[in-house]
Regions:
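Short, well-ordered coil↔helix boundary/capping segments
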Residues: 63, 67, 91-94
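Short glycine/serine/proline-enriched coil/turn segments at secondary-structure junctions
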Residues: 11-15
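Glycine-rich phosphate-binding "P-loop"
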Residues: 54-64
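Metal-dependent phosphoesterase core characteristic of DEDDh/y 3'-5' exonuclease domains
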Residues: 2, 16-18, 25-56, 75-129
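A short, well-structured juxtamembrane/interface segment
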Residues: 64-78
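Two-metal-ion RNase H-like nuclease active-site motif
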Residues: 2-10
Length: 129
């Protein structure tokens, strides 16, 4: 199964603090989670203008701590496992992959079957012409 995802995060050149993650399967099922642990006071002007105003109300069920994010993502993957190897896809995926993996600690702690890389949609698009 292919899972397409995008993360919003706050980064300062040394740390990547996951703010939210949206994920969709190739068949259209969706997951959206927002971190209650992200320090939004550190958001840069772009995130302040383009991300924070679009987040759901804090009472929305999408909000959870990092452990809750990890558990919901793991459940989503298990629920939509079609028996084929899992593929992760994202547009300009480098930081997204790191932010996702850090929910488990290091990459060695990822659940069995979760790839240690994300396919890069922008590179694929550029190479395809």
């Amino acid at each position: 199964m292919r899972f397409f995802y995008d993360c919003e995060f706050i980064e300062d050149g040394r740390t990547i603090d996951l703010l939210s993650l949206g994920m969709v399967t190739e068949t259209g099922e969706e997951l959206y989670v927002v971190s209650t642990e992200c320090d939004i006071s550190r958001a840069n002007p772009w995130v302040q203008r383009n991300v924070l105003p679009k987040l759901p109300n804090p009472s929305d069920n999408a909000w959870c701590d990092r452990r809750g994010m990890r558990n919901r993502i793991t459940s989503f993957w298990k629920q939509h496992n079609d028996g084929n190897p899992m593929e992760l896809w994202a547009w300009v995926a480098a930081y997204d992959h790191v932010a996702l993996c850090q929910l488990w600690g290091d990459m060695a702690a990822l659940p069995h079957g979760v790839p240690r890389f994300t396919y890069e949609m922008k590179q694929y698009w550029m190479h395809a012409g």
